Amino acid sequence: MMSTLVVLLTICLLMLPLTARQLDADQLADQLAERMEDISADQNRWFDPVKRCCMRPICMCPCCVNG
């Protein structure tokens, strides 16, 4: 009975850090996405205001692909 409790406790303690680490990674990705949404076209160094499109060499924007 005692060994069963020790095994169960060990499994729970091993699982806790793994799930907590995964949540931390998700939170960092969410924060990065929120920061990227805050950048306007005026602050983006790749954005060309005349063409109203980006100037990246490899761009999949609709204005770059069509024109």
Curated annotation (Swiss-Prot):
GO molecular function: ion channel inhibitor activity; toxin activity
GO cellular component: extracellular region
Disulphide connectivity of cysteines: 53-63, 54-61, 59-64
Keyword vocabulary terms for this entry: Cleavage on pair of basic residues, Disulfide bond, Neurotoxin, Secreted, Signal, Toxin
UniProt main location, coarse: secreted
Tissue: Expressed by the venom duct.
Prodomain residues: 21-52
Annotated signal peptide: 1-20
A Pfam cross-reference name: Conotoxin
Protein location: Secreted
Free-text note on domains in this protein's UniProt record: The cysteine framework is III (CC-C-C-CC). Classified in the M-1 branch, since 1 residue stands between the fourth and the fifth cysteine residues.
Function, as annotated: Probable neurotoxin.
Assigned protein family: Belongs to the conotoxin M superfamily.
Protein name: Conotoxin Im3.1
Organism: Conus imperialis (Imperial cone)
